[in-house]
Amino acid sequence: RVCFAIPLPICH
């Protein structure tokens, strides 16, 4: 699982 917070927090 990869999570990013730019610009919104999204996890795949």
From Swiss-Prot:
Q: Which residues are annotated with the PTM Histidine amide? A: H12
Gene Ontology biological process terms, A to Z: defense response to bacterium; defense response to fungus; killing of cells of another organism
Query: Superkingdom, according to UniProt?
Result: Eukaryota
Annotated signal sequence is none
Cellular compartments per GO CC: extracellular region
Q: Which cysteines are joined by disulfide bonds?
A: C3-C11
Q: Where does the record place it?
A: Secreted
Q: Which UniProt keywords apply?
A: Amidation, Amphibian defense peptide, Antibiotic, Antimicrobial, Disulfide bond, Fungicide, Secreted
Give a brief account of the tissues where this protein occurs: Expressed by the skin glands.
**Record has Cell membrane as a keyword:** no
Where it mainly occurs, coarsely classed, is: secreted
Function, as annotated, reads:
Antibacterial activity against B.subtilis, E.coli, S.aureus, M.luteus and P.putida. Antifungal activity against S.cerevisiae.
Which protein is depicted?
A: Tigerinin-2
Origin organism is Hoplobatrachus tigerinus (Indian bull frog)
